[in-house]
UniProtKB/Swiss-Prot annotation:
Residues 1-23 form the signal peptide. GO terms for biological process: defense response to bacterium. Its main location: secreted. Residues 27-74 form the WAP domain. PROSITE patterns: WAP. InterPro entries: Elafin-like_sf, WAP_dom. The gene is WFDC12. GO terms for cellular component: extracellular region. It comes from Saimiri boliviensis boliviensis. This is WAP four-disulfide core domain protein 12.
């Protein structure tokens, strides 16, 4: 009798643990890409968020300017693009201007 109660208790605890861990895993990533961050930091700021679910609306939890913050994401990557390129910048119009890193990419036509 005691062993059956113990078994029921253990099974119940296992089920509660599984259900609780599924709630934690349920954090989904919001659409969009974090903006490029080219800032070098001497010291990191305390995080304002840990996951996208900590942010309101469409904002994502991104590492930007020395700490994790809730920011508005840039557009989704276009097909063939690289995660490292900043898709929020427009493609250059002519070949004369100085282009920061990320401008020569698969999404901008070569001139």
């Amino acid at each position: 009798m005691r062993s059956s109660r113990f078994l029921v208790l253990m099974v119940s605890l296992a089920l509660v643990t599984l259900v609780a861990s599924e709630g934690v895993k349920g954090n989904t990533e919001k659409p969009g890409v974090c903006p490029a961050d080219n800032v070098r930091c001497i010291k990191s700021d305390p995080p304002q968020c840990h996951t996208d679910q900590d942010c309101q609306g469409i904002r994502k939890c991104c590492y930007l300017h020395c700490g994790f913050k809730c920011v508005i994401p840039v557009k989704e990557l276009e097909e063939g693009g690289s995660k490292d390129e900043d898709v929020s910048r427009p493609c250059p119009e002519s070949g004369w201007e100085v282009k920061p890193p990320g401008f020569f990419s698969t999404r901008c036509p070569q001139k």
